[in-house]
């Protein structure tokens, strides 16, 4: 009963939320889902010049080890089920960053019969990074915005 009273006041949950969100923002592990030319800029962001490791962002090869997916490039209808399957294999909580105008809304290939007009039709997207292709700086900015969004999210008391 004493714990319920403290939880109603919000002190313990607020402190635990802040700690958990701080830990999550300092250790984001993205799963790369490079589909087109935006993937080259994503690799550029992970290289020595921009060094995403300094933000605690380390690329992982497996969806079971990742909590963030970066969808970079044109998503075709045949690739959409694979994207959803990889997303479903990621542990909770999971987030998605849509990188480039093709992933955001189909881009140059918007009216093609074989292109999904935005990956948000397949998976829920948290941050959109515009550009064709977006620069590595834009991706870093988008990832920093993702960290801010995670920091402000309630984990325990929803």
UniProtKB/Swiss-Prot annotation:
Cofactor(s) this protein cannot do without: [4Fe-4S] cluster
EC number per UniProt = 7.1.1.-
Q: Which GO terms describe its biological process?
A: aerobic respiration; electron transport coupled proton transport
State the annotated membrane topology for this chain.
Peripheral membrane protein
Where mainly located?
membrane
Q: State the NCBIfam families in the record.
A: nuoB_fam, PRK06411.1
Task: Fill in the subunit field for this protein.
Answer: NDH-1 is composed of 14 different subunits. Subunits NuoB, C, D, E, F, and G constitute the peripheral sector of the complex.
Under which name does UniProt file this protein?
Answer: NADH-quinone oxidoreductase subunit B
Q: Which organism is it from?
A: Bordetella petrii (strain ATCC BAA-461 / DSM 12804 / CCUG 43448)
Q: Which gene is transcribed and translated to give this protein?
A: nuoB
């Amino acid at each position: 009963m004493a714990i319920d009273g403290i939880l109603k006041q919000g002190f313990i949950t607020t402190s635990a939320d802040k700690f958990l969100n701080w830990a999550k923002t300092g250790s984001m592990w993205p799963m790369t889902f490079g589909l087109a030319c935006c993937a080259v800029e994503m690799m550029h962001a992970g290289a020595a010049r921009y060094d995403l490791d300094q933000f605690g962002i380390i690329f992982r090869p497996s969806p079971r080890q990742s909590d963030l997916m970066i969808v970079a490039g044109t998503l075709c209808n045949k690739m959409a089920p694979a994207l959803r399957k990889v997303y479903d294999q990621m542990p909770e909580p999971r987030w998605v960053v849509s990188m480039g105008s093709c992933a955001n809304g189909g881009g140059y290939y918007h009216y093609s019969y074989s292109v999904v007009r935005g990956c948000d039709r397949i998976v829920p997207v948290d941050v959109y990074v515009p550009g064709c292709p977006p620069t590595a700086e834009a991706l870093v900015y988008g990832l920093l915005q993702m960290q801010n969004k995670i920091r402000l999210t309630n984990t325990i008391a929803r």
